[in-house]
């Protein structure tokens, strides 16, 4: 755009495997009609709340008719970093650490980071790894972790008010020209694991409940 910002187009592609939607999958595996629109709606809803809370994001504005979002320019960390915040021991966390935890046990807004790399299965990386590899500074990591926990609480509290429980959620962060950490990408049902009365809610059902 002329003002230096970027325009993101929301598509109907989702992560999954063998034609089945799975937010934990690394590869884009299927197309669901209308999912781009609903992902944009949810992203607008949460980005506006997060911005209002004084947390930096790349969100500027959106156009639902065009399914586009105007965003501030941001660089990704390394070749892309995913940040997961977990309230419950489920999914890959449980598979890795099942010797040390019960399925579904509470976690204190546990934050972990993975490199975006489908071929390597999005490998986990520690704070020391990120700093020593020159991906980010220790201060940037501390900001990223605090922001992740604050944003996750905003999302979880909102879902709680709708009778829904957030178990975990995945974000992407980047940084601006001054090196400030900012939330980028989207906040959509496909990036979170949500339960209602102990039952997993698939993302398309969650969209329906969220915008009911």
Question: What would you call each of these model-derived segments?
Answer:
Residues 136-167:
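A long amphipathic alpha-helix within ATP-dependent nucleotide-binding catalytic cores
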Residues 5, 78-80, 163-166, 178-181:
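Coil-to-beta-strand transition motifs
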Residues 23-38, 120-147:
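Short histidine-centered catalytic/ligand-binding loop motif
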Residues 107-121, 152-163, 189-192:
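Phosphate-binding core of ATP-grasp and ATP-grasp-like enzymes
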Residues 187-212:
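C-terminal helix-cap and adjacent tail motif
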Residues 1-115:
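Active-site loop/lid in soluble adenylation, ligation, and acyl-transfer enzymes
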Residues 85, 166-186:
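Conserved metal-phosphate-binding beta-hairpin within the catalytic cores
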């Amino acid at each position: 755009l002329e003002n230096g910002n970027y325009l993101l187009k929301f598509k109907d592609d989702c992560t999954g495997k063998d034609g089945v939607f799975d937010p934990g999958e690394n590869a884009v595996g299927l197309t669901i009609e209308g999912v781009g629109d609903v992902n944009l709606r949810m992203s607008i809803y949460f980005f506006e709340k997060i911005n209002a809370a004084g947390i930096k994001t790349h969100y500027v504005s959106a156009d639902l008719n065009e399914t586009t979002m105007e965003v501030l320019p941001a660089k990704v960390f390394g070749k892309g970093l995913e940040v997961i915040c977990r309230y419950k021991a489920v999914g890959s966390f449980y598979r890795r650490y099942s010797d040390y935890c019960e399925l579904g046990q509470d976690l204190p807004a546990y934050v972990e980071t993975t490199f975006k790399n489908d071929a390597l299965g999005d490998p986990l990386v520690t704070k020391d790894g990120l700093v020593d590899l020159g991906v980010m500074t220790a201060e940037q990591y501390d900001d990223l972790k605090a922001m992740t926990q604050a944003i996750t609480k905003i999302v979880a509290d909102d879902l709680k008010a709708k009778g829904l429980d957030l178990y975990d959620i995945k974000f992407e962060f980047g940084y601006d020209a001054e090196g400030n950490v900012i939330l980028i990408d989207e906040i959509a049902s496909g990036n979170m694991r949500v339960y209602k009365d102990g039952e997993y809610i698939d993302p398309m059902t969650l969209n329906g409940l969220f915008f009911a």
